[in-house]
Amino acid sequence: RQKSKAKLLHLIQAEKLIFNVPNLISFSAINFEQVSSEIIYKISNEFTSRKIAIRSSAADEDGCYKSSAGEYTSVLNVFSDNKKEIIAAINTVILSYKKKRSVRPEDEIIVQEMLQDTIMSGVIFTHDLNTGAPYYVINYDDQSGLTDTVTSGESEYANRTLYVHRNSVNKLHSERFIKLLTAVQELEKTMNSQFLDIEFALDADLNPYLLQVRTITTQPNWNRAVVKRIDATLQGVQSFITERFKKLKGVYGKNTILGQMPDWNPVEMIGRAPRAL
C-alpha cells in the first residue's frame, strides 16, 4: 500500500535530498473539531506571518493502481495569522472529503508554507503517461510565477512540454532542467521506482522543490515492448544520419548540411500570378 501524500512528504523531507520539501505539518481530519484550538495554535507558531497552503491528503488520493488526484480541494494563499481564514480553509478541505464519502481516520490535512519567487513549476512524469515510452515528460509554466497552473490547467502558460529520453539527461544544456532532472533521478533511487508522477517548482536560484509525488497509475495499460521499439528506431535514425554525413567522393566541402528544399522551384518563388517587383 502506498503511503499518503502527507506521510510521503514527511519521509522525503527527512531524507535531505536535492529536492527541498516546503515546511509542513499534518494532522488527522476526523477529529479536527475536537482539537481545532490546539491545531490552530500549532499552525500559528510554525508559520508566523506567512502565506500557507491547506492541502488535501485523503486516504484514497494516491494509490498504486488508482488515483483520486484532483477530486479533493486544496486552498492556497491562506494567511497564517488569520485564525478564521485557516479554520474556513480546513473545513473546505474536509467538506470535499465528505462530498465523496464519510471521513476516515486515515484522512489527513497538510498545512504547508507557500513558495515565494517561483520561476517555474509543473509536473514531471518519469515515463510517458499513455504509452510508457522511456522519456521524462515535463509539463511546465515558466511565466506566471504560480505553482498550480499546470495541475489546474487554468493558465495560458500551462501547455509547455519538454521530452527528455531517460538515457540522455547528460546531453542537456539548460541549467534549470539539468538541476531539475538530477533531483528527479535521486528521488527515483530513494523511492526505488522509475514510475513517478511529480509536482515541482523551481525558485529564482534554481533550487528544486517537491510539492507532491505519487506512483503513475496507468502502468497496467502500457505495452512493455514499446521501450525496445523506440530504442531500435532511435538507433536506426542515428545510423541513417551518420551515413548521410559521411564525406562524398568528388563533392566539394567537408561538412554535410541537411535542408528542406534548399533549391527552390522558380515557379514556387514567383507564385501562380507573377508580377513585376
Where do the protein language model's features map onto the residues?
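Conserved divalent-metal-coordinating catalytic cores
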Residues: R1-I18, K84-I90, P105, G122-L277
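N-terminal beta-alpha lobe that positions the nucleotide/phosphoryl donor
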Residues: R1-I110, D117-I119, L196
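Active-site beta-strand->loop segment that positions catalytic residues and contacts the acyl thioester
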Residues: L115-Q116, L187
